[in-house]
Amino acid sequence: MQTYGNPEVTYGWWAGNSVVTNRSGRFIASHVGHTGLICFAAGGSTLWELARYNPEIPMGHQSSLFLAHLASIGIGFDEAGAWTGVGVATIAIVHLILSMVYGGGGLLHGILFDENVEDSEVLQAKKFKLEWNNPDNQTFILGHHLIFMGVACAWFVEWARIHGIYDPALGAIRQVNYNLDLSMIWQRQFDFITIDSLEDVMGGHAFLAFAEITGGAFHIVAGSTPWEDKKLGEWSKFKGSELLSAEAVLSWSLAGIGWMAIVAAFWCASNTTVYPEAWYGEPLQFKFAISPYWVDTGDLSDATAFWGHSARAALTNVHYYLGFFFLQGHFWHALRALGFNFKNVTASIGNEQKATFTIKS
């Protein structure tokens, strides 16, 4: 993390990232523990929503964000094709069990295992040490992340092809084969918000699966080849030396998640193919006052949650504002990674009483 030239810098308790910055074992512990928290939140919230679900009120008018996501991918339907929540409790309980497994793994890595995996006796584990200004180390780790995301995309494509997902045009679950038309995928970069074909949606995920797995394999191979053996010349400032750091990687992560949240907000607000009206409520209307926001357009006199708003309105607005603040975090950490010292700003403001001004005519 940025020290502004002070090698003995100390951090307050609130600067949690500083605890794991140069301790790869503890870094893994925080990741695994965070995964456990996400699983616990997903499982617990799903059970909470299921216990309060009222079949006489549209799902989108209730507190049903997790149920809506499950319904969209074809989970919770009986043999007659009606959504009854069958199997949902099982999925929620599995998430709760997994949260304990992940929590235990986080504790093991945080308390029992080595602080740094490079000290581990396991040869493969040593490869995941943290060297923030080493492009080989960072690209090797990036490659594994890309492969995991690619596998997740492939699983989703196969789930839609074999099990089927909910098609709002039919009002039923159907099997969806992906459309791997590359010209369509290219054009959908610009009009994806209006996409109305599940085949195109799955085609995009299939393409992402291929691109991410291929890219991940490339990065792993590239990371396993020392920089000096790649015939790329010296690892210089021009090529990123001394810019690649823990703070820089954090800023890029915040930029990615912030951008995805904002894109999801615009998509959720208006698209009824990926976010079916039956599960999320009616499409929203875009407004702008001090900042952008979206409002409901349907009759919500029967709404039971979100202060009288639909699940779509809650999901959209929360995603947008979380994305906005994630991007502010990106700018903050990116500037710090570039060497900008925010302390100079506060020092300048605090010294304004002693400042002298000269006006030249």
Swiss-Prot record:
Q: How does it assemble?
A: The antenna complex consists of divinyl chlorophylls (a and b) and divinyl chlorophyll a/b binding proteins and binds more divinyl chlorophyll b than does the antenna complex from high-light-adapted Prochlorococcus.
**Pfam families (UniProt xref):** PSII
Q: Supply the induction statement.
A: This transcript is moderately expressed at low and high light levels and is expressed somewhat more at 16 and 45 umol blue light/m2/s. The whole antenna complex is most highly expressed under low light; as the light levels increase antenna complex levels decrease. Thus at least in this strain the amount of antenna complex is controlled mostly at a post-transcriptional level. Transcription decreases upon iron starvation.
Q: What else is on record for this protein? A: This low-light-adapted strain contains 8 pcb genes.
Q: How does it sit in the membrane?
A: Multi-pass membrane protein
Membrane spanning residue stretches: 27-47, 93-113, 140-160, 201-221, 248-268, 315-335
| One Gene Ontology cellular component | photosystem II
Localization terms from the record: Cellular thylakoid membrane
Q: What is the lineage of its organism?
A: Bacteria, Bacillati, Cyanobacteriota, Cyanophyceae, Synechococcales
Q: Which InterPro entries match?
A: PS_antenna-like (IPR000932), PS_II_antenna-like_sf (IPR036001)
Protein name stated in the entry: Divinyl chlorophyll a/b light-harvesting protein PcbD
**Protein family:** Belongs to the PsbB/PsbC family. IsiA/Pcb subfamily.
Which NCBIfam families does the entry link to? PS_antenn_a_b (TIGR03041)
Molecular function per GO: chlorophyll binding
Co-factor(s) = divinyl chlorophyll a; divinyl chlorophyll b
What is one Gene Ontology biological process annotated in the Swiss-Prot or TrEMBL record?
photosynthetic electron transport chain
The species is Prochlorococcus marinus (strain SARG / CCMP1375 / SS120)
Q: What does this protein do?
A: The antenna complex functions as a light receptor, it captures and delivers excitation energy to photosystems II and I. The Prochlorales pcb genes are not related to higher plant LHCs.
Name the keywords, alphabetized: Chlorophyll, Chromophore, Membrane, Photosynthesis, Photosystem I, Photosystem II, Thylakoid, Transmembrane, Transmembrane helix
Q: Which domain of life is it from?
A: Bacteria
